[in-house]
């Protein structure tokens, strides 16, 4: 059983809805969807919420990193990372009427929810603002 100090991290490996450009997808997620959900995340005790989006430049950037270990580029359009202290935070947020009526249905406007994948696990911050962290303190 996990200690109460461990943080959970949900990674959503997302695909955009067909017909939406990468630029429009990122703009919608950052400027429309994120503001809808961020207040609920605060209300239910979430700690971090970040997004990274692939762009038109992503293939050329990956080419610069390519070698035997960096050969398999993922086809996802984004990665959303959400950190929270307990699964109840997420369960309670999803049960909130505002989530059910507004946030949940909003996903269908921009995301290919049938293809997107998720992974949950323990959050281990190892480098923050260019400084190494005590990785053991995050896992105690």
Swiss-Prot record:
Broad class of enzyme this protein falls into: oxidoreductase
Domain EthD, chain residue ranges per copy: 18-113
Segments crossing the lipid bilayer: none
EC number of the protein: 1.-.-.-
Catalyzed reactions: naphtopyrone YWA1 = norrubrofusarin + H2O + H(+)
Entry keyword set: Monooxygenase, Oxidoreductase
Keyword Oxidoreductase attached: yes
GO molecular function: monooxygenase activity
Recorded metabolic or biological pathway in which this protein acts: Secondary metabolite biosynthesis
Domain of life of the organism encoding this protein: Eukaryota
Coiled-coil regions listed: none
InterPro entries: Dimeric_a/b-barrel, EthD_dom
Protein family membership: Belongs to the tpcK family.
Function: Dehydratase; part of the gene cluster that mediates the biosynthesis of ustilaginoidins, dimeric gamma-naphthopyrones isolated from different fungal species. The first step in the biosynthesis of ustilaginoidins is the production of gamma-naphthopyrone precursor YWA1 by the non-reducing polyketide synthase ustP, via condensation of one acetyl-CoA starter unit with 6 malonyl-CoA units. YWA1 is then probably substrate of the ustZ to yield norrubrofusarin via a dehydration reaction.
Protein name as it appears in the record: Dehydratase ustZ
